[in-house]
């Protein structure tokens, strides 16, 4: 027995060394309230003592951090970090993430359950099913831009053995939303990219979401959700709902009761396919399922880390508030907003978070950054068309105005603006404005879609300019004949031919 007593400290030290995670950082801090080290020395640390933290260990379920104090190596309990005032100036971005991890709720969870590998394996199975419910947005330029932002915010994984490898993926949805997966995959919606209006706002949101991943929030929440429906049954239900709500593009109908409405078109040119998206009808269920229905405390923890990262990057300290304000305003004009309970909305604690960040009534975020609007233009264009097809005309106009004001509009934007004006106005002045935009589109477009001639014809008819309408309908028919035969093309040619015959008879 006595030999065991002699050997036990050595065995414990060996086990601790195995748990020691060699970090590359020295995190300086100043003691602000007296406490003692957690090693056998139990040294008293008075206020003003300088401490440099490095590796952490988990010893008998307790988080311990190695510290250099007055040239001596000591151990500090993770529960005593609240007595330290961290000195972050001069630290690398990685070091700041490591310091934030040490101060977060993740360290306590790690000491109790390790990396929760069993839960993570179960979550990975859920992610495979989740991937089947979304459509990824294809824009290589945008993907590369987001990767550059990620490297600024999160250059590498600072916590050794952390299972997450950060990646950003864009999915199609009009709703401003994100899904921060425990494996490091961060899904961000086209609707959110369209809602934000500066790179710094995007950085703030991404930093906040990375914090959720880094601090294992979804893993913790998923573990607590003991009443989970069987995986196959749940995702089968989600896919059924998704199939019903994602058919946002109307089936092509060239003739409806003898008349034609361009609103019945797929949505011109590049938007002729059904658009699959994760709608608000199922986003809440999915977030809850995957452990991403965060508590207010988890949101606040992630918010504080985002603020610290933005300060470190010398970015606008109001960027997170600006981003939240834009999301809040976008939600309020959403047709789905009034039908949802607060808990069902993508950001259930959003207004409370805004207040904590200093939000006041009548607060106005700054003007949009044209460079950011240009980079994210395709996502905004996609969102605008989806909003239009859903009947959200106010939101559609907001998105179009953002594109136009930033000089980021292309043919599809001008055409959508024209269609929107016809859908919402009978004023001749609005029709004249639409015609000016269409002519500008013709001058700037790299290549013309046949539908621009159709849209110009509809505007001429609104203005009662029969000759102009006849000319553009001829142009439309000729352009259709030169293009590859697509679905419904024969019907469109037949319709425009009938229209020309009708006009020739003066009807």
Where are these regions (language model features)?
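C-terminal capping/extension segments of zinc metalloprotease domains
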Residues: 22-30, 39-50, 54-136, 156-163, ...
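Short alpha-helical catalytic segment bearing the HExxH-like zincin motif
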Residues: 187-188, 201-209, 225-226, 285, ...
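Post-HEXXH active-site segment of zinc metalloproteases
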Residues: 218-245, 324
């Amino acid at each position: 027995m006595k030999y065991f007593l002699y050997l036990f400290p050595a065995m414990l030290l060996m086990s601790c060394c195995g748990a020691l995670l060699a970090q590359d950082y020295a995190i300086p801090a100043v003691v602000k309230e007296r406490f003692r080290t957690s090693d056998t020395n139990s040294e008293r640390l008075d206020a003003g003592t300088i401490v440099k933290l490095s590796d952490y260990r988990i010893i008998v379920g307790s988080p311990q951090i190695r510290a250099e104090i007055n040239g001596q190596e000591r151990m500090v309990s993770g529960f005593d970090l609240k007595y330290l005032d961290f000195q972050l100036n001069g630290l690398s971005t990685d070091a700041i993430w490591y310091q934030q991890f040490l101060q977060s709720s993740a360290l306590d969870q790690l000491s109790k359950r390790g990396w929760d590998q069993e839960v993570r394996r179960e979550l990975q199975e859920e992610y495979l099913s989740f991937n089947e419910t979304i459509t990824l947005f294809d824009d290589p330029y945008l993907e590369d831009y987001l990767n550059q932002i990620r490297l600024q915010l999160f250059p590498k994984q600072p916590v050794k053995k952390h299972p997450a490898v950060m990646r950003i993926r864009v999915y199609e949805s009009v709703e401003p939303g994100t899904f921060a997966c425990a494996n490091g995959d961060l899904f961000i919606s086209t609707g959110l990219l369209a809602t934000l209006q500066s790179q710094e706002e995007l950085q703030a949101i991404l930093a906040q979401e990375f914090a959720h991943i880094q601090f294992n929030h979804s893993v913790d929440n998923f573990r607590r959700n003991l009443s989970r429906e069987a995986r196959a049954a749940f995702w089968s239900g989600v896919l059924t709902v998704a199939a019903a709500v994602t058919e946002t593009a109307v089936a092509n109908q060239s003739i409806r009761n003898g008349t034609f409405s361009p609103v019945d078109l797929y949505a011109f040119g590049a938007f002729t396919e059904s658009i699959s998206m994760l709608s608000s009808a199922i986003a809440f269920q999915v977030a809850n399922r995957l452990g991403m229905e965060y508590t207010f405390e988890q949101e606040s923890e992630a918010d504080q880390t985002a603020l610290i990262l933005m300060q470190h990057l010398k970015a606008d300290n109001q960027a997170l508030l600006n981003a939240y304000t834009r999301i809040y305003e976008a939600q309020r004009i959403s047709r789905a907003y009034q039908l949802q309970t607060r808990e069902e909305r993508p950001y259930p604690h959003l207004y409370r978070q805004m207040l904590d960040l200093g939000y006041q009534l009548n607060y106005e975020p700054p003007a949009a950054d044209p460079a950011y609007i240009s980079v994210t233009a395709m996502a905004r264009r996609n969102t605008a068309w989806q909003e239009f097809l859903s009947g959200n005309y106010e939101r559609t106009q907001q998105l179009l105005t953002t594109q136009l004001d930033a000089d980021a509009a292309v043919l599809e934007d001008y055409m959508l603006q024209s269609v929107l004006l016809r859908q919402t106005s009978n004023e001749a002045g609005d029709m004249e404005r639409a015609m000016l935009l269409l002519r500008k589109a013709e001058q700037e477009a790299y290549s013309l879609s046949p539908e621009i001639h159709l849209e110009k014809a509809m505007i001429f008819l609104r203005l009662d300019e029969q000759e102009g309408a006849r000319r553009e309908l001829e142009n439309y028919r000729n352009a259709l004949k030169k293009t590859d035969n697509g679905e419904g093309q024969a019907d469109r040619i037949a319709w425009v031919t009938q229209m020309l015959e009708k006009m020739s008879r003066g009807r």
